[in-house]
């Protein structure tokens, strides 16, 4: 059986990257929440 996590840098960036987050309203909300919380890393 194949494991669920098959790492890929391209897929990681496309799905969870900064530009992917900024593309939708809810994604921008995630970025703002993480900024407000003071996260060192905002997204992948």
Swiss-Prot record:
Gene Ontology MF terms: structural constituent of ribosome
Residue intervals passing through the bilayer: none
Regions annotated as coiled coil: none
Source superkingdom: Bacteria
InterPro entries xref list: Ribosomal_bL34, Ribosomal_bL34_CS
Keyword Glycoprotein: no
Entries under Gene3D superfamilies matching the protein: 1.10.287.3980
GO cellular component: ribonucleoprotein complex; ribosome
Keywords: Ribonucleoprotein, Ribosomal protein
One Pfam family hit: Ribosomal_L34
Presence of keyword Ribosomal protein: yes
Biological processes annotated in GO: translation
NCBIfam families named among the record's database cross-references: rpmH_bact
Family: Belongs to the bacterial ribosomal protein bL34 family.
Name this protein carries in UniProt: Large ribosomal subunit protein bL34
Organism this protein belongs to: Neorickettsia sennetsu (strain ATCC VR-367 / Miyayama)
Lineage of producing organism: Bacteria, Pseudomonadati, Pseudomonadota, Alphaproteobacteria, Rickettsiales
Gene designation per UniProt: rpmH
């Amino acid at each position: 059986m194949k494991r669920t996590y098959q790492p890929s840098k391209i897929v990681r960036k496309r799905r969870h990257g900064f530009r992917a987050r900024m593309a939708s309203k809810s994604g921008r909300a995630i970025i703002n929440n993480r900024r407000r919380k003071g996260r060192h890393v905002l997204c992948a």
